[in-house]
UniProtKB/Swiss-Prot annotation:
It comes from the Eukaryota. Keywords: Kelch repeat, Leucine-rich repeat, Repeat. This is F-box/LRR-repeat/kelch-repeat protein At1g09650. LRR repeats lie at residues 78-101, 239-262.
């Protein structure tokens, strides 16, 4: 039976049935199916349908991986964006529709979290983008005040020894509003308060300050993580704390002490694993991952990575904590497998099965850039 015949058969079904079938499909075929009829196009472009389709995709298997700014060596051409289906041995290059093909425009960092299939690309000296890798939809982000200040400081910025914190990206769980957030330490760059917080507002297409900002300085190296409608950072205190920013009320609070103290910023990471806030400390020869129970405010040990074993891929000298990316379905196994990578070598993604204590390569290349997991969706921001 030809594709045309199958589409004609689908059109003869009640449209409610057609919708139920369509929402179980991936984003790529749905983009093509918009050409079948005006009714199909209207359905597929409906925000309600897109939410249901995204929920189905989340429940149907593992996420894909977006690899940002891959570069094999200093003389190689940078590949701005490539996407990988886990289990595949090759990745697919994604065109960047917002820029001319200029080398300097291909290098970005990426928010540690995706949100409804959207990711946030950023750089400390140039405009960023909220981007949907599946549909190629994007929204440019103008320079925030921090970026403008760093540009004004110029080359003197490097003499300050200032560590620029990473951009956070999340969603207000009550209103569904998406918010890029830049929280940064202020004193080194001539600002008065301990920290400054800027939030991007899509309704005005502008950044605005949040006041009061965070009461504690933050550790600049680990990226912020969004869990359950709040962004989280490590505080720069003798006793490391977890600082939370509620994306609805836009207020800060300390939610817990970390399960470790007096640590170097390169030895700790924060991540979202199955919608749970997790933190991890590298303490050679292991790296323990802790999961936070928001109900009783306690931490429990989720698993431990043996860095002696991973040194075969990551090198004998581990200078910073590896970064967990996602928990993968273990099929019949009770516990899911952990996907993680080395932030220094950026060549290999490894899967750890905590039940069997095994380690396997999920993907390997000369460069994997900055990887972030996402579920492909049709969602955009109007």
């Amino acid at each position: 039976m030809s594709k045309k015949q199958r589409c004609l058969m689908m059109e003869s079904l009640p449209h409610e049935v057609v919708e139920c079938i369509l929402e179980r499909l991936d984003a790529d075929p749905l983009l093509r199916f918009k050409a079948v009829s005006k009714q199909w196009k209207s359905t597929i472009e409906s925000p309600f349908f897109q939410r249901r389709q995204f929920t189905q995709r989340q429940q149907s298997g593992n996420p894909d991986v977006l690899m940002v700014s891959r570069c094999a060596d200093i003389n190689s051409e940078i590949e701005a964006l490539t996407t990988l289906v886990l289990g595949s041995s090759s990745s697919v290059k994604i065109p960047t529709p917002w820029e001319e093909e200029e080398e300097e425009d291909k290098e970005y960092s990426v928010s540690q979290d995706s949100c409804d299939g959207l990711v946030c690309l950023f750089d400390k000296f140039k405009s960023g983008f909220v981007f949907n890798p599946a549909t190629r939809w994007y929204h440019p982000l103008p320079l925030c005040q921090l970026q403008q200040l760093l540009i004004a400081i110029g080359d003197g910025f490097y003499d300050l020894g200032y560590r620029v914190s990473r951009l956070g990206f999340g969603k207000d769980k009550l209103t569904g509003t998406y918010k890029p957030v830049w929280l940064y330490n202020s004193i080194e760059i001539g600002l008065e308060n301990a920290t400054t917080c800027e939030v991007f507002d899509f309704s005005t297409n502008a950044w605005r300050y949040v006041s009061p900002a965070a009461p504690y300085r933050i550790v600049g190296c680990p990226a912020p993580v969004c869990v359950d409608g709040s962004l989280h950072w490590f505080t720069e205190c003798e006793e490391t704390k977890i600082l939370s920013f509620d994306l609805h009320t836009e207020t800060f609070q300390v939610v817990s002490k970390a399960p470790f103290a007096n640590v170097d910023g390169f030895d700790i990471v924060m991540c979202n694993l199955d919608n749970r806030l997790c933190v991890s400390e590298m303490k050679l020869p292991n790296q323990v991952i802790w999961s936070f129970n928001s109900g009783n405010k306690t931490w429990h040990k989720m698993c431990s990575i043996n860095l002696d074993i991973t040194s075969r891929w990551f090198g004998p000298t581990q200078v910073c904590a590896v970064l967990p990316l996602a928990l993968l379905d273990g099929k019949k196994k009770k516990k899911k497998k952990l996907l993680f990578y080395c932030r220094v070598r950026k060549r290999t993604m490894v899967v750890h099965d905590d039940e069997t204590k095994s380690y396997d390569v999920a993907f390997e290349a000369d460069s994997i850039g900055h990887p972030v997991c996402y579920f492909p969706s049709l969602i955009s921001i109007s």
